[in-house]
Swiss-Prot record:
Its EC number is 3.6.1.-. One of its GO terms (biological process) is mRNA catabolic process. It holds the Pfam family NUDIX. This is RNA pyrophosphohydrolase. GO terms for cellular component: cytoplasm. A motif (Nudix box) lies at residues 38-59. CDD domains: NUDIX_Ap4A_hydrolase_plant_like (cd03671). GO terms for molecular function: mRNA 5'-diphosphatase activity. Residues 6-149 form the Nudix hydrolase domain. Belongs to the Nudix hydrolase family. RppH subfamily. It is an enzyme of class 3 (hydrolase). The keyword DNA-binding does not apply. It comes from Shewanella denitrificans (strain OS217 / ATCC BAA-1090 / DSM 15013).
Length: 172
């Protein structure tokens, strides 16, 4: 679904573990890393698209995650001109994204990058919370910074255990 301004409706997914680390995935056959993301199908809500993409890209089912929060608004980024396909109608100049922060309820073994038979990613790892902002491709960096800043209080709050003390987090 491309809107009248040329932006494709899309969802972004940040999966965090009990230590506040986030899942960082390498695009199949490339050297670029990013969070899972994908477009909305016609008639699909952002949450429905998120669950579909979650399974297609990383093999996780709704019962294996918990939605902690989502962005208050849609965030946009423009594609570099070299990536804009002029032969498609309508022309897509970028993405508008609704982001979701998920807590992994299962274990790492539940993550399956080949669940759909057409993998988007060929590797993944847990990284510290702010690492992706510095490492993502430059045209997505501003959106990543905004999302991570918006989600930071939720991530910190969920890391606190029942005694009110922060859990020890491994270094990476």
């Amino acid at each position: 679904m491309i809107d009248s301004d040329g932006f494709r409706a899309n969802v972004g997914i940040i999966i965090c573990n009990q230590y506040g680390q986030v899942m960082w995935a390498r695009r199949f056959g490339q050297h670029s890393w990013q969070f899972p993301q994908g477009g909305l199908d016609d008639g699909e809500s952002a949450e429905e698209a998120m669950y579909r993409e979650l399974y297609e890209e990383v093999g996780l089912r709704p019962e294996q995650v918990k939605i902690l929060t989502s962005t208050r608004s849609w965030l946009r980024y423009r594609l570099p001109k070299r990536l804009v396909r002029q032969d498609s109608k309508p022309v897509c100049i970028g993405q508008k994204q609704k982001w979701f922060l998920l807590q992994l309820n299962g274990n790492d073994n539940n993550i399956n990058l080949n669940s759909s038979g057409h993998p988007e990613f060929d590797d993944w790892r847990w990284v510290n919370y702010w690492y992706p902002v510095r490492q993502v491709v430059s045209f997505k960096r501003d959106v990543y910074r905004k999302v991570m800043k918006e989600f930071a209080p939720t991530t910190l709050a969920f890391q606190v255990n029942d005694t009110g003390r922060k859990r020890n987090r491994p270094r990476n």
